[in-house]
Regions:
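Short amphipathic alpha-helix segments
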Residues: 9-25
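Preference for short coil/turn "hinge" residues that link or interrupt alpha-helices
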Residues: 22-25, 29, 56, 61
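Residues that form or flank phosphate/diphosphate-binding pockets in enzymes
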Residues: 15, 39, 53
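Amphipathic, hydrophobic secondary-structure cores in small proteins
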Residues: 1, 10, 26-46
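C-terminal structural segments of small proteins and small subunits
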Residues: 48-82
C-alpha cells in the first residue's frame, strides 16, 4: 500500500526529508497532489508500506504532519484511493 502525509509547514516537510535520509524508509518528498489541501506545497509519499509501519516511523522520528491517507501510486501519478 502507498500512503501520503501532508504538512502544515515547509519546515516540517524538510524535517521529514532529513529523517528519510537518517532513518531510511521507502519514502520521498513530492509536490502535493492536486486533490489534497495542505499548509505547504509538499507531501511525503510512502511506497509499499503498511499503515502501522508508517505511523511507527512518523512517531519514532517525531514528524509533525496534518493528514495520513492511503493513495494509489502508478506510473508516477498519485491519485486518491476510492
Amino acid at each position: 500500500m502507498n500512503y501520503i502525509i501532508t504538512f502544515g509547514t515547509t519546515t516540517a516537510a524538510i524535517q521529514c526529508d532529513s529523517m528519510i535520509k537518517a532513518d531510511p524508509i521507502n519514502a520521498k518528498l513530492v509536490p502535493i497532489p492536486g486533490f489534497l489541501k495542505a499548509g505547504c506545497g509538499f507531501a511525503c509519499l510512502f511506497q509499499n508500506a503498511q499503515k502501522e509501519e508508517v505511523k511507527s516511523w512518523i512517531g519514532k522520528n517525531n514528524i509533525s504532519y496534518e493528514t495520513l491517507i492511503e493513495v494509489i501510486y502508478e506510473n508516477g501519478l498519485i491519485s486518491p484511493k476510492a
